[in-house]
């Protein structure tokens, strides 16, 4: 049975889900974490990435920092009021949880000998200073969660093995060119909740990255950044101050299948802007200041979900969502939200939603002046 402390850890870390929408239980069982010998499972010489927890015999290392809990290769030292990274951490540790402490600095040798570490959780500390070689021993680190700290810059010399970086809710104002140099494996960055403006991104700041997912929400952006990785599948820029989408703003991002622009101040989307997104499946434009349905939606053959609620839309035309003729759209809508708009829904023609899978997928009404 899973110990209570481990269950609490898993539940706590599953609050901020990455783009794959995986809970922390999946994350903990990822390749390289709670590994078991396949000999115990199938008799072969290879290892399994997802062990059968009922058949795993708990192993406790003789090295466990005072006050921490150590189980398998997980070291949990959260909520202890720690001022520094503890010593005596077993070198075979794959997950080190140090969240909710008072750590203010990461020193050169804090992670010395932890060459097998796969995930490092430093969320909700007071970290403002990181030695340039602090992460050097972490040659297998893939997940670094360092959100809710006092950082004013992206940490230098991040491990080249890094796949996922969560650095939201810090004090970062600038992303300089070269800060992500050498991070060829990185595919997910969460950096919302920082006071970033458009001018804070130096040209070439994301050069070399092949990201699938990027979130820069709750920042100070006034427009869509034009120099983000063109490999992006998901881009979330919600809760900013974006006022318009101009023709070439999305030109670079033709591989997007999910775009989040909710809770901005968007009044205008230039005609043709959305035509650069042929693979788009989900579009969030809720809580803006749009007065009409954006042009170009019928041409997005794979679009399935559109959030347009809480805008100023007063009219919905018969061809605003669906292309004329049958067989043109490759995927039908399964979600269109239009509630909290001043549109008289009783005047909308039924044929407007001829390419929607079910009438329950359409949300109208609840407008308040």
Curated annotation (Swiss-Prot):
The two attached glycosaminoglycan chains can be either chondroitin sulfate or dermatan sulfate. Residues 17-37 form a propeptide. Coiled coil: none annotated. Residues 1-16 form the signal peptide. One of its GO terms (biological process) is bone development. GO terms for cellular component: cell surface; collagen-containing extracellular matrix; extracellular matrix; extracellular region; sarcolemma; transport vesicle. LRR repeats lie at residues 83-103, 104-127, 128-151, 152-172, 173-196, 197-221, 222-242, 243-266, 267-290, 291-313, 314-343, 344-369. It is found in: Secreted, Extracellular space, Extracellular matrix. This is Biglycan. Belongs to the small leucine-rich proteoglycan (SLRP) family. SLRP class I subfamily. Glycans are attached at residues 42, 48, 271, 312. Keywords: Disulfide bond, Extracellular matrix, Glycoprotein, Leucine-rich repeat, Proteoglycan, Repeat, Secreted, Signal. PANTHER family: AGAP008170-PA, BIGLYCAN. Found in several connective tissues, especially in articular cartilages. The keyword Repeat applies. InterPro entries: Leu-rich_rpt, Leu-rich_rpt_typical-subtyp, LRR_dom_sf, LRRNT, SLRP, SLRP_I_decor/aspor/byglycan. Disulfide bonds join 64-70, 68-77, 322-355. May be involved in collagen fiber assembly.
């Amino acid at each position: 049975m899973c110990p209570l402390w481990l269950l609490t850890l898993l539940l706590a870390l599953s609050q901020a889900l990455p783009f794959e929408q995986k809970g922390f239980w999946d994350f903990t069982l990822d390749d390289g974490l709670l590994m078991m010998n396949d000999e115990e499972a199938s008799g072969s010489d290879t290892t399994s990435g997802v062990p059968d927890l009922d058949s795993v015999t708990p192993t406790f290392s003789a090295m466990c920092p005072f006050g921490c809990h150590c189980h398998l290769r997980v070291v949990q030292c959260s909520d202890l009021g720690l001022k520094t990274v503890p010593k005596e951490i077993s070198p075979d540790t794959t997950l080190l949880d140090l969240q909710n402490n008072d750590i203010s600095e990461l020193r050169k040798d804090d992670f010395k000998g932890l060459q097998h570490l796969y995930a490092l959780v430093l969320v909700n500390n007071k970290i403002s200073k990181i030695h340039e070689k602090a992460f050097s021993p972490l040659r297998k680190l893939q997940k670094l969660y360092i959100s809710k700290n006092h950082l004013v810059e992206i940490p230098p010399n991040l491990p080249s093995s890094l796949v996922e970086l969560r650095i939201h809710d810090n004090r970062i104002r600038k992303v300089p060119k070269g800060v992500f140099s050498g991070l060829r494996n990185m595919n997910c960055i969460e950096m919302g909740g920082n006071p970033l403006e458009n001018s804070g991104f130096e040209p070439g700041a994301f050069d070399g990255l092949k990201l699938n997912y990027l979130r820069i929400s709750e920042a100070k952006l006034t427009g869509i950044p034009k120099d983000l990785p063109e490999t992006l599948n998901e881009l979330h820029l919600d809760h900013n101050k974006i006022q318009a989408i101009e023709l070439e703003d999305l030109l670079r991002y033709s591989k997007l299948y999910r775009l989040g622009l909710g809770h901005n101040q968007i009044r205008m989307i230039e005609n043709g802007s959305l035509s650069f997104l042929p693979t788009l499946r989900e579009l969030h434009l809720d809580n803006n200041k749009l007065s009409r349905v954006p042009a170009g939606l019928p041409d997005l053959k794979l679009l399935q979900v559109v959030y347009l609620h809480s805008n100023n839309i007063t009219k919905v035309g018969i061809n605003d969502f669906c292309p004329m003729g049958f067989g043109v759209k490759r995927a039908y809508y399964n979600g269109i939200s239009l509630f909290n708009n001043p549109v008289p829904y009783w005047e909308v023609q039924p044929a407007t939603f001829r390419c929607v899978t079910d009438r329950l997928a359409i949300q109208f009404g609840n407008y308040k002046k």
